[in-house]
Amino acid sequence: MSQTESTKGVKITNYAAIKNAPLPADGPGAKNFSNWLLLGLLTGVPLFVTRKFHGGLKTFIFFFILFAIPILMAYWTVLSSYSPRLNEKVQFPNRGVEHYLKFHDDQLAARYQGQNKIPMETFHELYFEGKVSFKGDALDALEYRHDWASFRFTLSLFRFFLLGMIPEVIMHSRSQDEEQVRDHYDRGDDFYSWFLGDRMVYTSGLISDVNKDESLEELQDNKLKTVCEKIQLKEGEYLLDLGCGWGTLAAFASSQYGAKVTGITLGKNQTKYGNDKIASFGVDEKQSRILCHDYRDTPLPKDENGNTTKYDKITCLEMAEHVGVRKFRSFLQQVYDMLDDDGVFFLQYAGLRKSWQYEDLIWGLFMNKYIFPGADASTPLDFVVSALEATGFETVSIDNIGVHYSATLYRWYKNWLSNRDNVVNKYGIKWFKIWEYFLASSTIISRQGSATCYQIVLRKNLNSYDRAGYISTQEGLQGPISRKTDWVK
């Protein structure tokens, strides 16, 4: 089969670099969702009841508050249950639920069979509890999820959104951030090494050749070099890496480019691991170091004379999502204030598509509940760019690397499966299943555009900035220019 083969108008790919989709189907979503109708119901129902009771403004406000949540829940439930698919180019095999899943409860088996599909949120909760299993590989079954699962909103989904996620969005205190990050990242370095591999990088790598099956280490090395080249990192420059993880970028930039790097993380295990990694490359701690700090306490660097200065370059790879929507602008302002006026800010940001499908939202709530609690700032691109520009940054370039993330996640998934016994023996079967589902579903989600990742290069929007000096880093322009042919005879 060729790299892409058309089946009823839909391309079925066969690239070596990624996990190719056998059933790239679209579901229902934003195209059939009317905010105006929802607003009409939210105001119309309490207004109707108010008039029946011959009440005034206070009565209307009372009924508005009383009915708001039930109306929202009913509206989302009905639309997620009965809205038509975005398109029906891809036909489902209609094999029945029992072809893909094995229930370990007779009542559940009787309830979900044939074309009576199980809600995806219900499924993954039952899967983690051991009440249902995949018949075969998890990722293979999830590729055909439209054939056995629905994306209807459930009561437990609403409960988590209202009582779990919303309070976290509102609060996002220092203590909350510290508790969530340390609970997640200090679980144990071995836990993460069992899927991240030797590089210990928990962010997307980059594909260099879509027709080549590169290793996870090659993908991550491609990314490390790309980051340093995009910011034109030079020897002796002060680099700040916010959310540095296990310090791999800090070690790379220090040893390969001679930069003076400060890495910031809330993870205690990550701090020790990162400093040990930097030292293993023969880099003195006076040159580069990892600090266990809240990002709000990031220190400015000091020059050779002991004077406080600013950072020449700042990188932030998939950490900004943890800041929270409410704190996002203040976070960017802090970055702006710490960056030299001639400096460069590199932001790698995991975002969501604006034209969402219900599947996307259910996956996002799963991620917030089980994988990245408090990471509510994953948003569509326009929110990020608007916030950056309002802070005073100017965009140099934006690259969408969502499919690169899918390739990275697929390799993490295979690593995780190969370490099943290690995980189960130390952390239990439930943790194995949660991460198995996370890595498998995310491989699909990032490949199909539900969630994606952007590399954004930024500078301060000042009149004095040397914009011409960064033309050579704009590969999206330089690549096509270098391949052009003369057309004038």
Swiss-Prot record:
It is found in: Membrane. The lineage of its organism: Eukaryota, Fungi, Dikarya, Ascomycota, Saccharomycotina. It comes from the Eukaryota. This is Sphingolipid C9-methyltransferase. It catalyses: a (4E,8E)-4-sphinga-4,8-dienine ceramide + S-adenosyl-L-methionine = a 9-methyl-(4E,8E)-sphinga-4,8-dienine ceramide + S-adenosyl-L-homocysteine + H(+). InterPro entries: SAM-dependent_MTases_sf, Sphingo_C9-MT. S-adenosyl-L-methionine binds at residues 202-203, 239-247, 265-270, 295-296. One of its GO terms (molecular function) is methyltransferase activity. Disruption phenotype: Produces only non-methylated glucosylceramides. Shows no alteration of growth and no increase in the level of resistance to plant defensins MsDef1 and RsAFP2. Belongs to the CFA/CMAS family. Pathway: Lipid metabolism; sphingolipid metabolism.
